[in-house]
Regions:
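Amphipathic terminal alpha-helices
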Residues: 2, 299-319
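N-terminal Rossmann NAD(P)H-binding glycine-rich loop of SDR-like oxidoreductase domains
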Residues: 3-23
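Rossmann-fold cofactor-recognition segment
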Residues: 42-54
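NAD(P)H-binding glycine-rich loop region in Rossmannoid oxidoreductase-like domains
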Residues: 52-92
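Catalytic helix-loop patch of NAD(P)-dependent Rossmann-fold dehydrogenases
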Residues: 84-99, 112, 120-168, 175, ...
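NAD(P)-dependent short-chain dehydrogenase/reductase
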Residues: 125-131, 153-214, 218-227, 243-245, ...
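C-terminal "lid/loop" region of Rossmann-like NAD(P)-dependent oxidoreductases
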Residues: 203-204, 208, 235-238, 246-253, ...
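Non-catalytic, hydrophobic alpha-helical segments
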Residues: 221, 225, 240, 251, ...
């Protein structure tokens, strides 16, 4: 299988490349810039540096690579950024998506396209609606969520109107090594690693600890992407999550249990988010029925992987 990954130097992209290589696929990648993620890529992959805002570039990629599968991971992935820069978030997430779909039509591509939406498409869900199935109405409550609804529905539209082979993935929170420290697990783990290395005071800064989220290790999410491309049904949407919700408080406690230091926890107002819902977790039965997918890495082991990554980073920062 010739697989093209957009955003290959991003957090998820590098992990997906490893998963697909492990499945014997030929992997090609495209990235907006060289980026820090380049160092983690398998040396056999040299990504094309290109701007997916340009339609002609995507047509050339399709001509040159002739992919059997396209995993569209590129985009602006952080909810708070979407409050600060809503228009940029919409442009960065919607335009490349539309360009890829239109390029596939123009080039009569029969590739299977995996669109990465998000649990943020569901947005404002009541606790009584848990777990969230793919039938739950889409009520995004931030600009990032709106951009992801648009990507998801553009995929559906091009499947219905042009017969494109599209799968719509709706991953819930994923965590793992190399994730940006703006995300909660990475943020806490990095702070602990920096404190252990003597690079920071023994205080960990946190936001809302009561929120409960469905966290899946990035490797398990990437395996789900690969399985959906192999076995999913064209046009369908699939939730990806463990089906369990863990509080941010518990996430913090697990990470703190991995260190011998005594660390003060300090809640900060600027780490609180507007419109934060208290709990969300996935009904993943559709994904499991279609592919047999099961998560393989426990929440606790996943957090240990994150902390070990930041400990290694702290060591190299101390030199």
């Amino acid at each position: 299988v010739r697989a093209l990954i957009t955003g290959i130097t991003g957090f998820a992209g590098g992990h997906l490349a490893d998963v697909l290589l492990g499945r014997g696929h030929q992997v090609f990648g495209v990235a907006r810039d060289e980026g820090a993620g380049l160092q983690y890529l398998n040396p056999g992959i040299s990504p094309v540096i290109a701007d997916l805002q340009e339609p002609a570039i995507i047509e050339k990629l399709l001509d040159d690579i002739q992919p059997d599968a396209i995993y569209h991971l590129a985009g602006q992935a952080f909810v708070p950024t979407s409050w600060q820069a809503p228009w940029d978030t919409l442009a960065n997430n919607i335009r490349p998506q539309l360009n890829i779909l239109q390029a596939m039509v123009n080039r009569q591509s029969t590739a299977r396209l995996l669109i990465v939406a998000s649990n943020q498409v569901y947005g404002h869900v009541e606790t009584s609606q848990m777990p969230v199935s793919e039938e739950t109405s889409l009520r995004p409550d931030n600009p990032y969520g709106v951009s992801k609804v648009t990507q998801d529905l553009l995929g559906l539209q091009y499947h219905l109107s042009h017969g494109l082979d599209v799968i719509r993935a709706r991953p819930f929170n994923h965590i793992g090594p190399r994730q940006s420290p703006v995300f909660v697990a990475s943020s806490f783990a990095r702070q602990i690693a920096w404190i252990e290395a003597g690079l920071s005071e023994p205080v960990i800064k946190v936001g809302n600890l009561d929120a409960r989220r469905d966290f899946t290790d990035v490797i398990d999410v990437m395996q789900a992407y690969a399985l959906l491309v192999e076995q999913g049904q064209a046009g369908e949407a699939y939730n990806i999550g463990t089906g369990q919700a863990y509080s941010i408080q518990y996430l913090l406690e697990v990470l703190l249990s991995y260190t011998n230091l005594s660390i003060e926890v300090k809640q900060e107002a600027d780490r609180m988010r507007p419109a934060d819902i208290s709990v969300i977790y996935a009904d993943n039965s559709k994904l499991r029925a279609a592919t047999g997918w099961e998560p393989t890495i426990s929440f606790e082991d996943s957090l240990r992987r994150v902390l070990d990554y930041w400990r290694a980073e702290a060591k190299s920062n101390r030199k």
